[in-house]
Amino acid sequence: MLKIAVPNKGSLSERAMEILNEAGYAGRGDSKSLNVLDSANDVEFFYLRPKDIAIYVAGGQLDLGITGRDLAADSRADVHEVLSLGFGSSTFRYAAPAGQGWSIEKLEGKRIATSYPNLVRDDLAARGITAEVIRLDGAVEISIKLGVADAIADVVSTGRTLRQQGLEPFGESLCTSEAVIVGRRDEEITPAQRVLLSRIQGILHAQNYLMLDYNVDRDRLDEASAVTPGISGPTVSPLARENWVAVRAMVPLKSANATMDKLASIGAEAILASEIRIARI
């Protein structure tokens, strides 16, 4: 039986559980449940602190886990990314009071508050900077106002919380992050794990693509196919209308409108886009 770790709370939790549910797995009926047995799919899900997930996976107690790239890196657990999930995007930045001309070099000898001490220590060491790293488990932004730190290092999504506290990020980002599935390093994916990953990839593909159908003169088919190459080539079927064909292809959701405009410009007709619920590609 597969043992899979899922964030029990926080920004990654809700979306991770939605994807698993859409992929056909049992959900967490009670928000206080620590584990859910999905006997139909031969999987048990464990709801854990996001910061701890990579440690459990590296230790062999769990097969795979959903966590943040930054959290996995800060844990220093011996894991690797198996699949990026495309949500929970953020950057990890230094920040300090706005308008004071901070730079990374000015961190020398200063106090830096963070919930990611290992990431910060590694970055400072790589830059040859000596500073005091103060670990906090939350509300890092208020630490400067309370006199605990001179600067902070934290996850930045919109930057609104920083601005509310009169802070601004400075220097280049320490890392970029998003939700990922991690597995033990140097361990091959098993067939059972591959099924789960395939289901999740199918959901991600379905969310990021549309199915496009249209009719076009066969003489313009090469042009149309160049606009809609699909995943492994478009599906082309003859129409009763002489010298015309029906074409079907997957297109990225983000560029669907521009793609439809291009098709219309070369004479395509009856251009229709439909959602994809589940896919295996």
Swiss-Prot record:
Q: Which gene encodes it?
A: hisG
Role played: Catalyzes the condensation of ATP and 5-phosphoribose 1-diphosphate to form N'-(5'-phosphoribosyl)-ATP (PR-ATP). Has a crucial role in the pathway because the rate of histidine biosynthesis seems to be controlled primarily by regulation of HisG enzymatic activity.
> Would you tell me the protein name for this molecule?
ATP phosphoribosyltransferase
Recorded family membership:
Belongs to the ATP phosphoribosyltransferase family. Long subfamily.
Keywords, comma-separated and alphabetical: Amino-acid biosynthesis, ATP-binding, Cytoplasm, Glycosyltransferase, Histidine biosynthesis, Magnesium, Metal-binding, Nucleotide-binding, Transferase
The record's section on NCBIfam families has: hisG, HisG_C-term
Q: What PANTHER family does the record tag this protein with? A: ATP PHOSPHORIBOSYLTRANSFERASE (PTHR21403:SF8), ATP PHOSPHORIBOSYLTRANSFERASE ATP-PRTASE (PTHR21403)
- Supply the source organism for this entry: Corynebacterium efficiens (strain DSM 44549 / YS-314 / AJ 12310 / JCM 11189 / NBRC 100395)
Activity regulation behaviour: Feedback inhibited by histidine.
Q: Does the keyword S-adenosyl-L-methionine apply?
A: no
| UniProt xrefs under Pfam families | HisG, HisG_C
Q: Mind giving the lineage of the organism this protein is from?
A: Bacteria, Bacillati, Actinomycetota, Actinomycetes, Mycobacteriales
Q: Where in the cell is it found?
A: Cytoplasm
Q: Name one GO cellular component term.
A: cytoplasm
Q: In which pathway does it act?
A: Amino-acid biosynthesis; L-histidine biosynthesis; L-histidine from 5-phospho-alpha-D-ribose 1-diphosphate: step 1/9
